[in-house]
Curated annotation (Swiss-Prot):
Lineage: Eukaryota, Viridiplantae, Streptophyta, Mesostigmatophyceae, Mesostigmatales
Species annotation: Mesostigma viride (Green alga)
Disulphides: none
Signal sequence range: none
Protein name: Light-independent protochlorophyllide reductase subunit N
Family: Belongs to the BchN/ChlN family.
Pfam family, one: Oxidored_nitro
Pathway: Porphyrin-containing compound metabolism; chlorophyll biosynthesis (light-independent)
Name of encoding gene: chlN
Length: 446
């Protein structure tokens, strides 16, 4: 194990392995977000079984994604990958006619060195439909980084300039066109994206576009000097591509998760545009007051993050502000530059609440974590699904980290949903005690 101390924050790295949900699961929310897209996952039967089980798709639902299943002939190079992928893409175009086809590479395509990036432009010319290639394999990426690779690939497809006609129309309709363009990146449900747009509009800031957009044909314009701001902590690759390739200016802000994070996010964007934020104190205080029934349940309770979805730092920061004690933040991967503002806010909250700084363990060793959980006996462990039942059997209340990925947790109004998830096992324990039960399982399990 290696440890690096930065001021009062201690970063540790254990095994170097990822113990997370598979990153190809990003298909679950991205195909719903980009309405005119089709996702083609190129992998083995294992990938297909995972998608069927993890996404819970009905047989007759006909979702806008599919599996291109690799067979022995593909792996031994007896079949022509180019011809097979061309046939599949032609079939997709005929059946669905999407505006874009997204190829999702998996562990197997990485191991057998399939040249997806080389084949895609040729097939794109043949079928006259854009093909975006994203390598979302579990060898190189953790759970939510699948979305990061897709968005990073889509950055290259964003237009650089707007046509003269549409520009003149836009100027005539928008008198505030003097504001530098602001593009937000990260996939959110339309309702949540609208809430964040509205919060910024109240401060006099207009959002020029979102990456990804609701439709592929509406991707935002990215010119040199465009301001960009992320809404999720796992999008560091996308942020890097936006800065290096498109010369955009990244706004380094905490992420809009919880009322404290949302306020800090808005304040940072306002400061970049030289705008004095209005009524944010009252807005945040109203939200905290509305959460009081949940806060009474979590104050003084302890929580341990095993690490899965890269939302751990933001969630821990919010829970510390709620009055909880965080023993450890396990996280599969962390870009310290991209999350610098989030880490600073975490440290500030720890000082304000007079609680010790949690350990931050990158790529944690699950065996060591289990030993630490056994010693610390936290009130709650937020963990991947694989460890939930074994921990419950040992008397540790758990919550699946994957639930925070699929829940609506961004913005002022959705803070309640975070606490609803966190307090569910705590409320269950209170209900059991009311019935005279001490636990759900037999004691003395070793």
């Amino acid at each position: 194990m290696s440890a690096v101390t930065s001021d009062t924050i201690t970063f540790e790295c254990e095994t170097g392995n990822y113990h997370t949900f598979c990153p190809i699961s990003c298909v679950a929310w991205l195909y719903q977000k980009i309405e005119d897209s089709f996702f083609l996952v190129i992998g083995t039967k294992t990938c297909g079984y995972f998608l069927q089980n993890a996404l819970g798709v009905m047989i007759f639902a006909e979702p806008r994604y599919a599996m291109a299943e690799l067979e022995e002939g593909d792996i031994s190079a007896q079949l022509n990958d180019y011809k097979e992928l061309t046939r599949l893409c032609n079939q997709i175009k005929k059946d669905r006619n999407p505006s874009v086809i997204v190829w999702i590479g998996t562990c197997t395509t990485e191991i057998i060195k399939m040249d997806l990036e080389g084949m895609a432009p040729k097939i794109e010319l043949e079928i006259n439909t854009p093909i975006v290639v994203a390598r979302a394999n579990g060898l190189d990426y953790a759970f939510t980084q699948g979305e990061d690779t897709v968005l990073a690939a889509m950055v290259e497809r964003c237009p650089a300039k707007i046509s003269l006609d549409s520009n003149s129309n836009k100027e005539s309709k928008n008198p505030e066109s003097e504001q530098a363009p602001l593009v937000l990146f990260g996939s959110l449900p339309s309702t949540v994206a609208s809430q964040l747009n509205l919060e910024l509009k109240r401060q006099g800031i207009n959002v020029s576009g979102w990456l990804p957009a609701q439709r592929y044909t509406d991707l935002p314009i990215l010119e040199k000097g465009t301001y960009v701001c992320g809404i999720n902590p796992f999008l560091s690759r996308t942020a890097t591509i936006l800065m290096r390739r498109r010369k955009c200016k990244l706004i380094g802000a905490p992420f809009p998760i919880g009322p404290d994070g949302t306020r800090a996010w808005i304040e940072k964007i306002c400061s970049v545009f030289n705008i004095q934020p209005q009524n944010l104190d009252e807005r945040e205080n109203q939200v905290w007051q509305s959460l009081e029934d949940y806060l009474q349940l979590v104050r003084g309770k302890s929580v341990f993050f095993m690490g899965d979805n890269l939302l751990e730092i933001s969630l821990a920061r919010f829970l510390i502000k709620c009055g909880m004690i965080v023993y450890e933040i396990g996280i599969p991967y962390m870009d310290k530059r991209y999350q610098a503002a989030e880490l600073a806010l975490l440290e500030k909250h720890c000082n304000d609440m007079n609680v010790p700084m949690p350990r931050i363990v990158e790529k944690p060793d699950n065996y060591n974590q289990i030993q630490r959980i056994k010693e610390l006996q936290p009130d709650l462990a937020i963990t991947g699904m694989a460890h939930a039942n074994p921990l419950e059997a040992r008397g540790i209340s758990t919550k699946w980290s994957v639930e925070f990925t699929f829940a609506q947790i961004h913005g002022f109004t959705n803070a309640r949903d975070i606490l609803e998830l966190v307090t569910r096992p705590l409320r269950r324990n209170n209900s059991l005690e009311g019935l005279g039960w001490n636990s759900l399982v037999k004691e003395n399990i070793k």
